[in-house]
Amino acid sequence: MALKHFNPVTASLRGTVLVDRSELWKGKPVKTLTEGKHSTGGRNNHGRITSRFRGGGHKQTYRYVDFKRRKADVPATVERLEYDPNRTAFIALIKYQDGELSYILAPQRLKAGDVVVSGARADIKPGNAMPLGAIPVGTIIHNIEMKPGAGGKIARSAGTYAQLVGKDAGYAQIKLMSGELRVVRAECYATVGAVSNPDNSNIHIGKAGRSRWLGRRPHNRGVVMNPVDHPHGGGEGRTSGGRHPVTPWGKPTKGYKTRTNKRTDSLIIRRRNKGK
């Protein structure tokens, strides 16, 4: 998919850059693979805000996407590629030889009419899923399971991928886009290829209204609040906040480590690259 640039006939279109989705399916999704979805507005079951700056936006329908790919050795034909409002990647509708329909994450270079299959004996081509132990070292993969049978968790958003860099003693080593090197069980499934829609990172929203369509509300800084609202609030005139950056609840931000799962620390060989 290419990027769409616009003539500046309005102020908001001057810098707008969007993904051209003209090649995607323009109809409705398969009804049996969808479910209604209620907007929470960032509130929990007590009505309290647990995720700030969320609310509004276009009504969405949830699509059931198969992240497990456990229907082994049954070829499926790609019927079409579709837009999914719940994720940045595109999804593909596939039809198995026995007639079952399913949605999967669409990898790059997958198109209608292609045949995909999952299983240990599948070919190494985009869209095919198999255990990491059956994938050659150096292959680009996505939708990687962290536990066998739990469904893919790693490399699922638009344009992402990982690389299988080694196999040893029943474990597979994978290198993530962040630079992290970690191991997972060799029985875990992964799908060959990189996730579709790599141009998603080049989108320029262009105007506040488009953010509202996506359910994003205005984000205001702590230094413009009152002391009752934020640790950076208050002061006479414009201030810098007067302290190292913290969250509204007083915890350090900007690089503060929050990982606490020591049980799986041994599965991370090298931590991700730090930002500048």
UniProtKB/Swiss-Prot annotation:
GO terms for biological process: cytoplasmic translation. One of its GO terms (cellular component) is large ribosomal subunit. Keywords: Ribonucleoprotein, Ribosomal protein, RNA-binding, rRNA-binding. Residues 213-264 are annotated as: Disordered. The lineage of its organism: Bacteria, Pseudomonadati, Pseudomonadota, Alphaproteobacteria, Acetobacterales. The keyword Transmembrane helix does not apply. It comes from Granulibacter bethesdensis (strain ATCC BAA-1260 / CGDNIH1). This is Large ribosomal subunit protein uL2. It holds the Pfam family Ribosomal_L2. InterPro entries: NA-bd_OB-fold, Rib_uL2_dom2, Ribosomal_uL2, Ribosomal_uL2_bac/org-type, Ribosomal_uL2_C, Ribosomal_uL2_CS, Ribosomal_uL2_dom3, Ribosomal_uL2_RNA-bd_dom. Coiled coil: none annotated.
